[in-house]
Amino acid sequence: AGASVCHVDASKGMTAWAKENAALCGISDIRFIVDDCIKFVSREIRRGRKYDGIIMDPPSYGRGPGGEVWKLENELYSLLTLCLDVMSEKPLFFLLNSYTTGLSASCMEYMLGVTVARRFGGKVTASEIGLPVERSGYILPCGASARWER
């Protein structure tokens, strides 16, 4: 309904998989970019492009082309702060998803609160992601998600 979507991932394989999934769903108007997200966002800021929403599912760990180490728990705050400058004046949402064991739902809620909510108002909610274990009825925790909305 008038929205445009841009998918950015440094992995060619993940991007190819996302393209395949979009095609299977009959969605053809997605801009797919294979690039480092930090470099991409920095370029978008210089170009003056703005986004009304961001869905972020960053990796827990990675290595750059020069062997530099990237760990989400060390880099998330700076990534969120960078993304503030690519968001429109009245953004609608920011979704953050992670399977990083050292990053709890409450930590993600706090990070969105002190970055996105501090700048744009709105509210932040977070929850644990889990898989139900049929035999015991318990939930096996496997990640967390947080959402900011206006």
Predicted region positions:
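A short helix-to-beta-strand connector/capping loop
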Residues: 3, 26-30, 120-122
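Conserved SAM-binding motif I beta-strand of class I
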Residues: 4-9
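S-adenosyl-L-methionine
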Residues: 10-55
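Mobile active-site "lid"/loop adjacent to the S-adenosyl-L-methionine
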Residues: 12-14, 34, 51-82
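Alpha-helical scaffolding segments of alpha/beta enzyme cores, especially the outer helices
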Residues: 20, 39, 78-85
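Short, well-ordered secondary-structure micro-motifs
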Residues: 43-45, 65-67, 106-107
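Helix-to-beta-strand junctions that scaffold the AdoMet/dcAdoMet cofactor pocket
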Residues: 87-89
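C-terminal catalytic and target-recognition region of SAM-dependent MTase-like enzymes
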Residues: 91-150
